[in-house]
Amino acid sequence: MAGHSQFSNIKYRKGAQDAKRSQRFTKLIREITVAAKQGLPDPEFNPRLRSAVFAARKENLPKDRIETAIKNAAGNVAGENYEEIQYEGHGPFGTALIVHVLTNNRNRAASEVRYIFSRKNGSLGETGSVSYLFDHVGLIVYKAESVNFDDLFSHGIELEVLNVEENNIEGLYVITCRVKDFGKVRNAFYAKFGEPELARLSWQPKDLIEISDKKLIDKLSALVEELEDNDDVQYVEGNFAFAGLSLKL
């Protein structure tokens, strides 16, 4: 029956969406846990934790789960210890990707990331195999609707950041700074403009490859999506952009 089939499809889609949401929550809690263990368990005095909590709230992670994760990390409650690892790989068409991982099993993570690259016409490389194509910087991003660009720019000059630019396609203001200055710059922008949409160390491509061919876009999108669907992968950075499309942070 058509009605039954449609209902089954709806249930399937809802199940897939729920699974994605659950996975996203797990990754957010993992980042909160690591951030709280690395510094003070108070977001006001731990910028990485503050950013993690802000991201969790944007995703509607329940407040009690955020607080429990912080308390468990602060109290050293028995649990899994996570290791931060960065993998470098080559994607199709000369693209380069850096995969950021938080894992409790290094061997499993490496095996799964390698398998995904090989399935999607790419290859996992050695440390340093693609990172030379990027600049390692501090990255701070604000929504254009939330702050005044001239004020942001002036503050950036005072702090001697590398760049403050407008991304009109995505409606964002993007600040980059030296890695050694990141903590100071992040705190200064937070004090004046509030919590940014994103604040983290980032690998920014020296030369951006713009891709407009739909088949190439589909193949690269499939690679990035499968990597980010992996439980251990927090996010992926690359040296490419899709022409005319807005990329998520």
Swiss-Prot record:
A Gene Ontology molecular function term for this protein is: DNA binding
Q: Which InterPro entries match?
A: Integrase-like_N, TACO1_YebC-like_2nd/3rd_dom, TACO1_YebC_N, Transcrip_reg_TACO1-like, Transcrip_reg_TACO1-like_dom3, YebC-like
Q: Which GO biological process categories is it annotated with?
A: regulation of DNA-templated transcription
The cellular location(s) given in this protein's UniProt record come to: Cytoplasm
> From which residue to which does any coiled coil extend?
none
> Keywords, A to Z?
Cytoplasm, DNA-binding, Transcription, Transcription regulation
* A GO cellular-component term linked to this record: cytoplasm
SUPFAM superfamilies membership? YebC-like
**Does the keyword DNA-binding belong to this entry?**
yes
Q: Which NCBIfam families match?
A: PRK00110.1 (NF001030), PRK12378.1 (NF009044), YebC/PmpR family DNA-binding transcriptional regulator (TIGR01033)
Protein family per UniProt: Belongs to the TACO1 family.
Q: What is this protein called?
A: Probable transcriptional regulatory protein Wbm0670
